[in-house]
Structure formats: C-alpha cells, structure tokens
Regions:
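An extracytoplasmic/periplasmic, membrane-proximal ligand-sensing/linker region
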Residues: 28-30, 170, 259-320
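N-terminal (or domain-start) structured segment
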Residues: 22-112, 148-151, 157, 161, ...
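A ligand-binding cleft/hinge motif common to bilobed small-molecule-binding domains
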Residues: 95-105, 167-171, 198-232
C-alpha cells in the first residue's frame, strides 16, 4: 500500500514541473494588440510600447488597427475574443470613460467586459485663442465672455476638445457657442484663420502654432504645467483651484483574463516606460507617465467616467 502511495506521489510530483512550466509559458505565441484608431499618435505609441514588451517577452506583439465609432468598433471586437491574453486593446481612455455616458447603445460594458492592464500615460489640453482676441489670461477671457458672445471650436461633438471646453466654460459660468468640426485638424486651421475664437487642443498638436504666434496660449488643463510650454500656467493656477483634466491611453484585456497575465503585462509596460527612448518620446509628445498598476488604472477609468457622465448630462451633449 505504502509503495502504491509513494508511486502515485512520485508521479504527481513529476507532473508539477511540466504544469508549472505550462502556467508560466505566457506568451507562448504572438499576441495581437488591437489599436482603436487609424495610424496616428495612439498607434505610434502602441507600437513603441509593444516593441519593448515583445523584446522582453520574446514573442511578437502584432498591431492591428480597427478604427471606428470613437473606439467602439475595436472594443466590441476585443470583447468577443478569448480571455487568454492573446488579444489586447490599446485605446484612448475615452472609449471607456466618455462613450458609456455619450452613446445610448454601447456594444460593450466598460466594467463587465474588460479588465485594465495599464493606463501608461496621461496628457492635458491647451487653451488657445486667436491673437485678435483681447485676452492674455484665463481671467481676461472669462471676463470678455461675460460681455460679448464668444465661440470655441472642437474636433466634434463628444470629442475630448469639446468635453474639456464644455467642462471649463460651465465651471467658469460663461456662455460659449460650440462649433464642432469633423476632426481636430480643421478646427485648428479655422482658429488660426480667425474664423473661430478659441480652442482646446492637445498641447503637442498646437505648440508650434503658439511659438509661431499664430495662436496665443492661455493655460493647460492638466494639474501640472507642460514641459513643452513651461511658461504657460495651468487652469488651476489661473483662478480655478483643483481644475485638472487629462486624457490617457489604456491597455485593456477581455474580462476573465488571468490575473497573472494582467500583472505581467502591467510590469512589462512599466519596464518599457523607463527606457530612455520612451522617456524622450513622452517628453516630446507631452505625455506624463503615470506608473499606474492594474488596480490604479481601473480606478482612473472609473473616476474619469463619473466626471464625464456629469459633464455630458449637464451640457446636454449627444452624438446619437
């Protein structure tokens, strides 16, 4: 009997290394990373980070673009994939923070269908005006808006530039006419051309126009000043203490993905973020590295979603 027990125990112990190796084998094949936009800033950043992770884990991380519906197309696709760590989503955080309260019919649940791996970077927006606008500070712009009608451009209804503007102007208590465009590019062109008076836009996208005196920068929306424009104050420093609006990139996985895989990928993102060329990329693009782990990343998405839900409701913003 004891011999039988010893034989069985030996057989079980012999299997343990093989089982452990199988459990630690991730990734054992290429990982597909779905990017929710066409090639552009998000795509470029996803490629940089995924290249670093691929080198570290010794498996390809293959980028595939699935653009459409402000990230909803990509999210719906990834939601339907096996929760095994081999299909991930790299998206702008608004897919999970803005789209749920903005779209009446959403093809995914941001909480039930996904798990956060990392929110690696955040970035603010810069409040700019056409040089003809007689306001050189946020306070002067607010006072001016109280005495005469002013307007602001955005990249479209529900876009980040629309949301941060609606949030700020409602906070300041001044009426502003919203002029939406189909994309940020044309909105910037029309503010430079003097056809629209003000605009919030990603700092890295307008800083060259500020330096060329085609736009005047009044403030940035993030809690910290931008390294690209250190002399430009924050909105919080300009009379609105606590005002802090940043958007972010998010690496997500289908709900049910094993936690050890989620934690591994999170650590790999942080390793990538610490590499000198990524640090320089962050500086040049005005990205602030967060150091967020999966739990902190999930909390970021929840708090941002709650804020934007209120802004969307209070300002009657809709895309349907």
């Amino acid at each position: 009997m004891y011999r039988t027990v010893r034989t069985l125990l030996a057989a079980v112990l012999a299997l343990v290394p093989a089982w452990a190796a199988a459990q630690g084998a991730y990734p054992a094949k290429p990982v597909k990373v779905i990017v929710s936009t066409v090639p552009g800033p998000l795509d470029a950043y996803a490629r940089i980070i995924c290249e670093k992770i691929a080198l570290s884990l010794k498996q390809p991380f293959v980028i595939e673009n699935k653009a459409g519906a402000a990230g909803n197309v990509a999210a719906e696709y990834v939601k339907g994939q096996p929760a095994d760590g081999y299909t991930l989503l790299f998206a702008i955080d608004t897919t999970f923070t803005v789209n749920p309260p903005l779209y009446k019919k959403l093809p995914f649940d941001p909480v039930k269908d996904f798990v956060a791996i990392s929110v690696p970077v955040t970035y603010g927006q810069m409040l700019t005006v056409h040089p003809s606008v007689p306001a050189k500070t946020v306070k002067e712009l607010v006072e001016l808006a109280k005495t005469k009608p002013l307007n602001y451009a955005s990249g479209g209804n529900g876009s980040p530039s629309h949301l941060v503007a609606a949030y700020f102007y409602s906070t300041a208590g001044v009426p502003m006419t919203h002029i939406p465009y189909k994309g940020t590019g044309q909105s910037v062109i029309d503010v430079i051309g003097g056809r629209v008076e003000t605009l919030f836009a990603v700092t890295s996208g307008v800083i060259q126009h500020v330096k060329g005196d085609k736009l005047r920068a009044l403030a940035v929306s993030s809690i910290k000043r931008s390294d690209l424009a250190a002399s430009v104050p924050t909105i919080a420093e300009s009379g609105y203490p606590g005002f802090d609006v940043s958007f972010a990139y998010a690496l997500m996985a289908p709900a049910g993905t094993p936690d050890d895989i989620v934690q591994l990928l999170s650590r790999e993102v942080q390793k990538a973020m610490a590499q000198p060329d990524v640090v320089e990329k962050n500086r040049a693009a005005d990205y602030a590295a967060t150091g967020m782990d999966p739990k902190q990343s999930a909390a970021w998405l929840v708090s941002s979603r709650e804020r934007w839900a209120k802004v969307i409701k209070d300002n009657n913003i809709s895309v349907d």
